[in-house]
Amino acid sequence: MAGNENGGELLQDAVCRTLAIEMLDGKWPAGESLTLEDVQNRFGISRTVAREVAKTLESMGAVTVRRRVGLVARPFSDWQALNHQVIEWRLHSTQRERQLSSLTELRLAVEPAAAASAARLASIDVKAKFPVYAAQMRQIAESNEEGAAGLTKFHDLDVEFHTLILRESGNELF
């Protein structure tokens, strides 16, 4: 499958994203169905690509695939909410605020435990990096560097810092 105009995104991924966002936005309500032929015609894709779309959405709990019926939308409570694609789709839907809230709550539950474990288990060399990251992030925040550059620098450091904590926690699920 070739990429498309969406930055090299696979066609089947673009179709999955579109259909998932429609479900999340309530445009394709739970319980309603689309045939594979509907998907093919709407997106101008082959039956093979439409089947891959169906398999992908089904693997994430977004649809049930039924013979002679097609793809039946499922309620969000059935979806694989921790799947990175599902999270991304929600962030691009009308569910964005709810997804951000859920992610914040998850971080508040996990990060203190990860930090406590990292404080116990990390080497002295790794522990010495923690205040360095904090100082660098504070410096960027206090510099009031405007625009995307300042935000990008802060975000990159924040991701590195939290990745280090999670990795050093000793819990492979973090």
Spans of features found by a protein language model:
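Short linear motifs at protein or domain termini
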Residues: 1-110, 116, 120
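Conserved amphipathic alpha-helical segments that form helical-bundle/coiled-coil interaction surfaces
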Residues: 103-174
